[in-house]
Each structure stands twice: as structure tokens, then as C-alpha cells.
Amino acid sequence: QTREFEERFLKIGMPYRILGGTKFYERAEIKDCVAYLRLIYQEKDDLAFERIVNNPKRSIGDSTLKNIHEFAKLNNLNLERASIKMLEQNLVKPKTKIGLNLFINSLSKWRNDLILKKSNHIKLLQIVLDESGYSAMLKNKKDVDNENRLENIKELLSAMKEFDNLESFLEHV
């Protein structure tokens, strides 16, 4: 695993390059996991929202995301708040409404788990991966790439043990 080397090089300020591969924290599955955690920690993180709102697939397409953006801009809201308001005002197609509602409700549940300290940051990510369907998405597509992605996520969970809480982990990445 390259993560440990990357962490050490970053810590001592030594420049490095990964040949023939992608840096650990730049891998799609790691970015997805971090995006989930960032959005749970800070609902105003629109970049994280965009990355994960339809990952795994929730029937939330580009046109819906465009509508959310326009509504957010018009009403001076972040994307999550805009989504909530759009759901309340029935401004979302029925098929999309189901997926978006589930996503918003899940975020709320995960935040409550974190706030009420029902789960630490490591357990929280495990819960998110299971409840969001992200783990199932990777497991259901049997190929070497997805097996590697699952291994990378295990490595991320292991790396998170070095941090006392979600805030310190997010500051690090």
C-alpha cells in the first residue's frame, strides 16, 4: 500500500510522485468516502454534495442537479438545503423524489449518530458505506478493480484510526 509512504512524505515535507498509479487520497473511492464524511460534518459543502448525491445511483440525474443548483442560487441556499426545500414544495419528479428523500434522510440520521456520539468516525464511515449502498455497489460488480477499491477503503478505515475524531481526520485530508 502506498498510503503509508505518502503520509510519511507529506509529514516530513518531502516531494514525491506516484509512478503508474494514483495517489491514495486522489482515488475515486477514497474521494467518495471523504465526500460523505465532509458532507455529514458540514452540510454547506456543495462539492461533497455534488460528488455523492447520486453515488451510488439514486435516480438523480444531471437535470435534477441543475434544478437544485438554480433553486439554491435563487434562494441563497446550499445544495442540501435547496434539495430539502424542493422536496417540501414538490418540485422534484416522483422517481427522483424517492432517491433524493432517502439521501437527505440518511444524511440527517448519520449526523445525529455523530452528534449523539452513537458512533465514532470510523464506525460512522462503515455505517455510511453499508446504508448508502456504496459497499454493495462495489461488491455486486465482481471485478479486480472493485476488489482493489474495497481494499483501499479498508486501508482508509485503518488510516482513520490515527485520528481522535472526524474533525481531525478531515483536517488531515
Q: What are the language-model segments listed below?
A:
Residues 2-15, 27, 34-173:
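Conserved helicase C-terminal RecA-like lobe
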Residues 20-24:
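Short, acidic/turn-prone active-site loops that include or flank metal/cofactor-
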